[in-house]
């Protein structure tokens, strides 16, 4: 993970840890003119590693975004931000996106009262995201919420930390996307 972060910059969804600055002498050797191919490849890799996608999944999202109305880049980021694993990460119910994927895969999360075990589930406005009533599920979420620093919540989400409940108000606005993409 540190190799990816050193190469691509900060990826908050992948890990909250940061490499020491100035500790990589190889990085200084790679300066110089960056080709268009390299820039596009790095931006694609940022998306893949931040959201935890395979190449095939990313291509499907690009295809869907290309067919939709509006800017393909903005629609792509909206599609990725409305995934269930990413919304759990944004709500603070998980420290990283891989951690949120694990919560979903282990059936700890309910969407509108139904168990959802697919991390790529596309959330819609007015979806209610809760934990299962089991004590173990609530304890996991409680630990994440207590240990995570309380960052500003995007305006398309609301959370009730005492009931372990989150609500998707609307589709995300482009200014709240946490990843800087060129």
From Swiss-Prot:
InterPro entries: Ribosomal_uS4, Ribosomal_uS4_bac-type, Ribosomal_uS4_CS, Ribosomal_uS4_N, S4_RNA-bd, S4_RNA-bd_sf. It is found in: Plastid, Chloroplast. SMART domains: Ribosomal_S4, S4. GO terms for biological process: ribosomal small subunit biogenesis; translation. GO terms for molecular function: rRNA binding; structural constituent of ribosome. Signal peptide: none annotated. Residues 13-34 are annotated as: Disordered. One of its GO terms (cellular component) is chloroplast. Residues 82-143 form the S4 RNA-binding domain. Belongs to the universal ribosomal protein uS4 family. HAMAP family: Ribosomal_uS4_B. Part of the 30S ribosomal subunit. Contacts protein S5. The interaction surface between S4 and S5 is involved in control of translational fidelity. One of the primary rRNA binding proteins, it binds directly to 16S rRNA where it nucleates assembly of the body of the 30S subunit. With S5 and S12 plays an important role in translational accuracy. This is Small ribosomal subunit protein uS4c. It comes from Iris lutescens. The gene is rps4.
